[in-house]
């Protein structure tokens, strides 16, 4: 089952940038929308970097924007996303949400379709904990009215979903990560407005509690965990502009730390941790209508950033996960909002490249 949610056409930023190396085929409605918004051909021409150190892998079974991922027992689980766009007579864009839930085996590069999400969602949070996958929040229908607070658990042994205690308040496009036995949730959007609220779910007590708020209000952020710290990277400001803000929450100290700014401002990015470093991948900037392939590595010990090899195909809104020292990216949009892709890439990070 798939569900459509709608947003005002003014909310959408379309991107046509870079080299005409890869042109994705648009449906008629996508082509017309781009022409209406000022792009002469309406075609998506993503930024491509053939010299990139990233490798092209087996494509997704479907084109998908804004999925999310988590790694469990050496396999990657992909949840939700956006599938398609159409324009209705009232001038609004209807975006089809996905209930797809898929397991990917990096060794064989095969996808296995699992029991669908309890409902079609996009911009969810996904984490793994003690042999289960947890999916939280997200958008279901209209962005400014239907942000979710539901909390679901997936059991791989039974291929079944169960309901968990919902978040105190709804949010989507948030930062989520496991620190010990607690799921920390920070940033994100509620009814299209970025929030700074931070909460934690304690798996031992089965209760939610409030933590100190994040210093900044951001959504569409990247998230990774190293030790006792949750890192929240980049994202979009209340003006929907990409930011270079980086902050971390220290669970043992119960306080936030402001970190050195990222080299490249970006929102709609992915992030992972490998060998104690935090790596931000891709994203975009609505302010200057760009999608970036930048891959930015942060060393928590030296508090320094450096750039790694950029994505082969720049994108934002992709699912990002790590298995061992390899980063995987799935889908996303090489041109903002209306060009889902099935592209999959990997980068092997050796000793902090």
Q: Model regions: which residues?
A:
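Kelch-like beta-propeller repeat domains
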Residues: 4-8, 18-353
């Amino acid at each position: 089952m798939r569900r459509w949610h709608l947003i005002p056409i003014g909310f959408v930023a379309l991107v046509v940038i870079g080299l005409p190396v890869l042109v994705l085929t648009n449906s008629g409605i996508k082509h017309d929308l781009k022409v209406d918004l000022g792009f002469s051909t309406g075609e998506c021409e993503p930024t491509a970097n053939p010299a990139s150190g990233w490798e092209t892998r087996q494509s997704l079974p479907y084109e998908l924007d804004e999925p999310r991922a988590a790694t469990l027992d050496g396999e990657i689980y992909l949840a939700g996303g956006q599938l398609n766009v159409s324009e209705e007579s009232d001038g609004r864009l209807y975006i089809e949400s996905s209930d797809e839930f898929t397991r990917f085996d990096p060794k064989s590069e095969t996808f296995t379709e699992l029991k669908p999400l309890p409902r079609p969602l996009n911009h969810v949070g996904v984490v793994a904990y003690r042999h289960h996958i947890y999916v939280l929040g997200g958008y279901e229908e209209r962005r400014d009215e239907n942000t979710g607070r539901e909390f679901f658990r997936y059991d791989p042994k039974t291929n079944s979903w169960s309901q968990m205690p919902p978040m105190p308040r709804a949010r989507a496009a948030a930062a989520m990560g496991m620190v010990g036995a607690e799921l920390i949730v920070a940033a994100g959007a509620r009814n299209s407005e970025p929030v700074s609220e931070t909460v934690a779910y304690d798996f031992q007590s089965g209760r939610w509690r409030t933590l100190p708020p994040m210093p900044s209000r951001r959504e569409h952020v990247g998230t990774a965990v190293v030790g006792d710290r949750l890192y929240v990277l980049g994202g979009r400001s209340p003006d929907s502009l990409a930011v270079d803000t980086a902050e971390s929450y220290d669970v043992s100290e119960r306080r936030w730390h402001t970190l050195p700014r990222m080299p490249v401002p970006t929102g709609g990015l992915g992030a992972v941790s490998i060998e104690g470093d935090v790596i931000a991948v891709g994203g975009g900037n609505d302010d200057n209508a760009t999608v970036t392939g930048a891959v930015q590595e942060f060393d928590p010990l030296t508090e320094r950033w450096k750039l790694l090899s950029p994505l082969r195909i720049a994108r934002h809104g992709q699912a990002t996960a790590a298995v061992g020292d390899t980063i995987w990216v799935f889908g996303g949009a090489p041109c903002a909002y209306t060009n889902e892709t099935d592209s999959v890439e990997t980068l092997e990070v050796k000793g902090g490249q």
